[in-house]
């Protein structure tokens, strides 16, 4: 597994001062250009959740779709989307959350989650945990539970994992990067 994790980490490029000065952007598009790294990413997440009683996989906009859909397919589970407002065609439920400078909102279809669903949330990167916390609230409002979330990248110093653990969500991340 260490070899796979090394391949994954080395396939992610770090772009300094993007999108603004002082930020190091972790670019997963370069991981997608290396089929062995992309496959290892999906395989490791699938193996982690194969026997956890998950009933639905949920991906957050937009890079969570890239990793969530193939994981759901490999697990033989339905895949649902969490999107920014006005991107879904049917009736939706929304949840607002605070950003560093302002507020954002996420939506999902009202029929995406059934009472008692055990949902796995997947996203590319865990920073502060705000997006996933809002997603957990959406799932709970629809009668589901979130005990697990998976990420390709974790930025531990931003505290997202602790924030999600405090909500009862166990986080699985493939690689950690210091600095943000």
Curated annotation (Swiss-Prot):
PROSITE patterns on file: PUR_PYR_PR_TRANSFER
CDD domains from the UniProt entry: PRTases_typeI
InterPro entries: Ade_phspho_trans, Adenine_PRTase, PRibTrfase_dom, PRTase-like
Catalytic reaction annotation: AMP + diphosphate = 5-phospho-alpha-D-ribose 1-diphosphate + adenine
Primary location group: cytoplasm
Gene Ontology annotations for the cellular component aspect, listed alphabetically: cytosol
Enzyme class: transferase
Enzyme Commission number(s) of this protein: 2.4.2.7
A GO molecular function held by the record: adenine phosphoribosyltransferase activity
Record key words, sorted: Cytoplasm, Glycosyltransferase, Purine salvage, Transferase
Pathway it works in: Purine metabolism; AMP biosynthesis via salvage pathway; AMP from adenine: step 1/1
Cellular localisation: Cytoplasm
Alphabetized Pfam families for the sequence: Pribosyltran (PF00156)
Keyword set includes Cytoplasm: yes
Single GO BP term: adenine salvage
Gene3D superfamilies listed in its UniProt record: 3.40.50.2020
Assembly mode: Homodimer.
Family affiliation: Belongs to the purine/pyrimidine phosphoribosyltransferase family.
Record-linked PANTHER family: ADENINE PHOSPHORIBOSYLTRANSFERASE (PTHR11776), PHOSPHORIBOSYLTRANSFERASE DOMAIN-CONTAINING PROTEIN (PTHR11776:SF7)
Function of the protein: Catalyzes a salvage reaction resulting in the formation of AMP, that is energically less costly than de novo synthesis.
Name of the protein in its database record: Adenine phosphoribosyltransferase
Organism of provenance: Haemophilus influenzae (strain ATCC 51907 / DSM 11121 / KW20 / Rd)
Taxon lineage: Bacteria, Pseudomonadati, Pseudomonadota, Gammaproteobacteria, Pasteurellales
Gene behind the chain: apt
């Amino acid at each position: 597994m260490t070899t796979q994790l090394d391949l994954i980490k080395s396939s992610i490029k770090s772009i300094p001062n993007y999108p603004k000065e002082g930020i190091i952007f972790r670019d997963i598009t370069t991981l997608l250009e290396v089929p062995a790294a992309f496959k290892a990413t999906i395989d490791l997440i699938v193996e982690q959740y194969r026997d956890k009683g998950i009933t639905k996989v949920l991906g957050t906009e937009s890079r969570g779709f890239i990793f969530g859909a193939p994981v759901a397919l490999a697990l033989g589970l339905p895949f649902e989307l969490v999107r920014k407002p006005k991107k879904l065609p049917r009736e939706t439920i929304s949840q607002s959350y605070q950003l560093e400078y302002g507020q954002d909102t996420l939506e999902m279809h009202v029929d995406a989650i059934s009472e008692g669903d055990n949902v796995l949330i997947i996203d590319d990167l865990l920073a502060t945990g705000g997006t996933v916390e809002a997603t957990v609230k959406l799932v709970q409002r629809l009668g589901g539970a979130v005990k697990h979330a998976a990420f390709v990248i974790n930025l531990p110093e931003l505290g997202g994992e602790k924030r999600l653990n405090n909500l009862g969500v166990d986080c699985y991340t493939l690689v950690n990067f210091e600095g943000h």
